[in-house]
Amino acid sequence: MRSMDRFGIWVLAILLVIQSSFGFYLPGSYPHKYEVGDYLNVKVNSLTSIETEMPFSYYSLPFCKPSEGIKDSAENLGELLMGDRIENSPYRFRMFKNESEIFLCQTDKLSADSLKLLKKRIDEMYQVNPMLDNLPAIRYTKRDGYVLRWTGYPVGIKVQDVYYVFNHLKFKVLVHKYEEAANVARVMGTGDAAEVIPTIGKKDSDVPGYMVVGFEVVPCSFAHNGESTKKLKMYERYTTPIKCDSTRVSMSVKEGQSIVFSYEVSFEESDIKWPSRWDAYLKMEGSKVHWFSILNSLMVITFLAGIVLVIFLRTVRRDLTRYEELDKEAQAQMNEELSGWKLVVGDVFRAPSNASLLCVMVGDGVQILGMAVVTILFAALGFMSPASRGTLITGMLFFYMILGIAAGYVSVRLWRTIGCGEHRGWMSVAWKAACFFPGIAFLILTTLNFLLWGSHSTGAIPFSLFVILLLLWFCISVPLTLIGGYFGAKAPHIEFPVRTNQIPREIPAQKYPSWLLVLGAGTLPFGTLFIELFFIMSSIWMGRVYYVFGFLFVVLILLVVVCAEVSLVLTYMHLCVEDYKWWWKSFFASGSVAIYIFIYSINYLVFDLKSLSGPVSATLYLGYSLFMVLAIMLATGTVGFLSSFWFVHYLFSSVKLD
């Protein structure tokens, strides 16, 4: 009865986590009330493209600049690492004031270099990403009877070898009447940099106000009369009507020609409430396919893992039960006729080769796995919303640094266990644990950063941020890892249940290479996550929104279970054929899933990112994929090793073999 109650509790918990993946989030900022006539300032993020994966500053192209100068918005660590550069723009509106034919500016005449760069950005399908009140602009297009939803709009378009630029923007701002229950101060400005303005002489309830709940844009290419705009100043009305037709283009770009930019804006009252304003971004097309595919994958993998677990437990338990039922004389006689895993009793806990490296990798794997579990759990509960840009990356860095204490503890305690309680060398192991994975990651990211620096991309990590990351590494992560190592050195080591012989036992020749089975074992864990992996890759490289962290958390838990089971089965199989070198094999039995993920990444590059242009972009993609695969290998390998270590210790402590 108790087991049924526990099962029901676990099922309820899983269902609650899955339910949280239906776009639930904590908004990340307070609703901002704008009175009629208040100014709304549009901001712009970096130019992005799925063809190059290299973001560039909005003002790297000949666009209009604000009269007060270009100002960067305050950005967190995660935004900078993601390549976001949010800046002010000259586009401004007045709340609930529809305006049309607004002249923005006339650029200088295009030089040969400016024209070449503009054409290159159009060829590479770069998108402009305006933002209002922290909401990215959405663009709707119709194709084959379907309505497609995009964020941002293209810089321009190429038609029959002629380049056209989108120089007139038609904005629509959806607003919802301010609700008194929100009880927020009147603010003026955008969502991520709002200035609080006290309301003097009147209460909020006396002042009608609105909240921004939607932001749409329609880009148009309109050929302005350059001569008639020379005397116009910014925000003055254009002399003739402008018809914005997104199906036609007329503003071609040529050397020695200037570009005139203009815009119009309309406001529309909407039933969308402020907490639901991100639903349009979170509910992307293909969601039904996503849900059913994930559910089907979970059912199949759970069923298969259950069968493997049942067969495995029955086999081992039957072996142990038969031994325990014998009397002492029969046990002594049976000990003389040992077979299978019982023959390696004197070698099963023999120290593996490169023991310190194994300890370091297991410690780093615990740190990475802990970071992933905590971060995804917080995201599934809604604490890391898309409204708060960069919080996911910032949270990952924070949890990774804090969990350095776990890496040091596990590495050193495992080192002392393998060394039968030896204290010498624990400081070296702790240092290696603090520097192994971060050092490799730093090497990969530095190499990729040089490529981004050479391309003048905003995705390049600034030197000041490099210094901050180094300080976080050596001033927080390393000391915490050493502290964890100290506690690991003070903690009692795990006693082995059997003694190790002085002379190693010879391993019988195998019919097939044992490492071949180890590498093949990664297919089962890969089957648990390859569907989810597609959506994650699409989010990273195709600019799609990913916010089903509830399902991702369930998949992560399932992955941990399957990795443990696969490693247990392979360890038992190796022991049965008298192969006692299980340490590294148990690690790579589950860690080999990283190989299949890297192969999948290459497949995704070839078939899904066909438009990715240039060796620099491909190198960036493969470099980031290698970084991701290394982290996955350490995390999954750690799960397999720790489960196998527990199993072997339990197996040989359950029966006395001398």
From Swiss-Prot:
Q: Where in the cell is it found?
A: Endosome membrane; Golgi apparatus membrane
Q: Which organism is it from?
A: Arabidopsis thaliana
Motif Golgi retention signal: positions: 656-658
Regarding protein family, the annotation reads: Belongs to the nonaspanin (TM9SF) (TC 9.A.2) family.
Q: Name one GO cellular component term.
A: endosome membrane
- The residue ranges for the Cytoplasmic side of the membrane come to 313-364, 413-432, 484-515, 569-586, 641-658
What phylogenetic lineage does the species belong to? Eukaryota, Viridiplantae, Streptophyta, Embryophyta, Tracheophyta
How does the protein associate with the membrane? Multi-pass membrane protein
**Primary site of residence:** membrane
Any Pfam family from its record, for instance, is: EMP70
Membrane-spanning residues where? 292-312, 365-385, 392-412, 433-453, 463-483, 516-536, 548-568, 587-607, 620-640
Write down what this protein is called: Transmembrane 9 superfamily member 11
Q: Which stretches face the Lumenal side?
A: 24-291, 386-391, 454-462, 537-547, 608-619
Any idea which UniProt keywords this protein has?
Endosome, Golgi apparatus, Membrane, Signal, Transmembrane, Transmembrane helix
Q: Where is the signal peptide?
A: 1-23
